Amino acid sequence: MGRKWANIVAKKTAKDGATSKVYAKFGVEIYAAAKQGEPDPESNSALKFVIERAKQAQVPKHVIDKAIDKAKGGGDETFVQGRYEGFGPNGSMVIAETLTSNVNRTIANIRTIFNKKGGNIGAAGAVSYMFDNTGVIVFKGTDPDHIFEILLDAEVDVRDVTEEEGNIVIYTEATDLHKGIAALKAAGISEFSTTELEMIAQSEVELSPEDLEIFEGLVDALEDDDDVQKVYHNVANL
């Protein structure tokens, strides 16, 4: 899964570079999680997980606090999750996950992006069956066998554990991501660079330079949309 790890790192690095966008999107996600339960991460596990991910992306504390305070203050916005799937050139596939307070606006924007950027939007499930919803945990380390034993002892359903560039990279069943994190924390590991649910392509395609330029424009436009939280694809050379 080394190539998958490289793609995740590349995507994360690209998003981390656009800091204002990252902060704004995490602000929305934190607010939505706080509104759905108690605005206290100690009693709201979903909120706690989002805050941990925000810290990994180096979102400042004041951005996190502002989103929680907005939820505490009775903000009346309601956010709805969505997923849009489609195709790019030559066998390329893309999934955009959204969090929006205006579904009609989001649908219109996503359709426009696909139409203008050389893609074709598909029906629900059109490409997601070619992706696996996967827990990804990353932290500094060089002994994947030892980590695998820790997870095995904790009965975590693990797909793979690898060492990549001085990092331990763990792929779990999506339902066991939090169980895996808890097992690692119990073993004394507390600093993570990634704890995410990712849609990982079962197989990948490589595009020609011309097709890659088109597909990259599609992905960039989706990622730039304020309502889009995550974009997944199956292109190996992007």
From Swiss-Prot:
Subcellular location: Cytoplasm
Gene Ontology terms for molecular function: DNA binding
Keywords noted in UniProt: Cytoplasm, DNA-binding, Transcription, Transcription regulation
Superkingdom of origin organism: Bacteria
One GO cellular component, as annotated: cytosol
InterPro entries assigned: Integrase-like_N (IPR017856), TACO1_YebC-like_2nd/3rd_dom (IPR048300), TACO1_YebC_N (IPR049083), Transcrip_reg_TACO1-like (IPR002876), Transcrip_reg_TACO1-like_dom3 (IPR026564), Transcrip_reg_TACO1_YeeN (IPR026562), YebC-like (IPR029072)
The keyword NAD is annotated on this UniProt entry: no
UniProt keyword Flavoprotein, yes or no: no
Pfam families xrefs: TACO1_YebC_N (PF20772), Transcrip_reg (PF01709)
BP GO terms, sorted: regulation of DNA-templated transcription
SUPFAM superfamilies named among the record's database cross-references: YebC-like
Matches recorded under NCBIfam families: PRK12378.1, YebC/PmpR family DNA-binding transcriptional regulator
UniProt record similarity statement: Belongs to the TACO1 family. YeeN subfamily.
Protein name: Probable transcriptional regulatory protein YeeN
